[in-house]
Amino acid sequence: ADQMKDPNPVAMADIIKTEELLSFPYNARGISLCRGTDWLLPQRIVAQMDPEQSDLFWQNSKSFWRFFIARCENELALRIIGSLGFVDLKNLNDSEQMRIAYREALLHFVKEAEQASCTGEDIEKLLTEVYHASPLSKSPLECVVPPDSPLRLGIHSNEQWLKTAEERYSSVYLDILGLISIGRYRQGDQLPSHAALQLQYGVSVVTTLQAVKTLKQWGVVETIRGKGIFVSQHPPAADQLPLSQKMVASYVKRYLENFELLAVTAEGVALYAAQSVSPAQAQALRQTLFDTERTGRRYPSYPITILEFLVEQIPYKAMQAVYATVLENQRMVIKIPGLVSSENPAQVLEMNRRCIGAADALAGGDTVAFAKRTAEMFQYVYQHIIEQCDRLHYLHAVKGLYDTSLLWK
């Protein structure tokens, strides 16, 4: 305990706000998904919260809230929220009286929230009540944290959110396959050199050699000594390649998790992002969408343009890092064979219409409508991607390989 330090007030304020923007909507969603026996575990956790044992009491409180986030079965969201530093925080402005009151609030919360008649609005109200009984609502929050805690250092890197056991080289060759499938590289085109690929993907020469070797074995590229790497004159179609189902399924899973995170959190995030937007910036967003429409460009798509705009405008560094990671992960779409080429034109038009509607609201100074429309647009996109993945039989593959209910059961 003597290793513990005071948090940095600036980093802490930033992360508390980020935690609210992520946890609040995810808790609400997790609660709304709970049915019948799902409630047994949270009930058991509250029952063993002893106000006389401070450390254990707060440990159980953290497990209680983690359960509802895990109930959403989104591993990316669970990892991100878990990495914000609250797990290791030791609460100081804490009395037995406060613990008794907080436990009472939790008992009331569980009793009310598990009623079948409990609506989304009821859940939000209940969450707000519990929040006011918790130490997080006490200002200033007195606590100590480990020396390397994000509550001291802030969050800049997203390394820990992206670690998966997937081979690095598969990421490189799937990306190249995707770029060929969307026409970025055509037959006979020269690909970047190994040195350039290493820089582009942040990998070693061993990784790029392995990736190019795989593409060569499949007849996708040819290498000419002293000249470089070229796309073959007759590269096979993506559906004829012996791609590992497990690998493609892992990308589908992460891609879906990214968009679900947007669908769940975008309303709160967009509302805060919009607060500092100048009329000129709002107009510029509208113009960017208009130019995309006029030139008939497909990349970046309208939803990605809105996401880029949010990343620029989010006032909290940690939240900005989260959305920047989601933006980076959008490139995954080209690693999933058939996903880009199977776009439904009518649905793409509807997505674009919704993006323009959101931008119009912002240009008109209505930040609440902007936030609402942005969230609805990402929810629509998320549903559209689920349908596409289902049509391509990817959902079945993901379910066969990953039992996401293990996150909470």
How would you label these PLM feature ranges?
Residues 237, 241-254, 284-288, 321, ...:
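Flexible internal linker/loop segments at domain or repeat junctions
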Residues 15-26, 61-72, 76-92, 176, ...:
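Short, structured motif recognition centered on aromatic/hydrophobic residues
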Residues 10-14, 43-47, 61-65, 70-82, ...:
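General nucleic-acid-binding
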Residues 1-21, 151-260:
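Short linear motifs at protein or domain termini
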Residues 6-54, 124-135, 249-289, 370-372, ...:
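Helix-turn-helix/homeodomain-like alpha-helical modules used for DNA recognition
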Residues 37-91, 125-137, 279-336, 373, ...:
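Conserved amphipathic alpha-helical segments that form helical-bundle/coiled-coil interaction surfaces
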Residues 96-158, 162-163, 336-409:
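C-terminal all-alpha effector/ligand-binding and dimerization domain
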Residues 34-37, 49-56, 73-75, 104-126, ...:
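Short helix-adjacent coil turns
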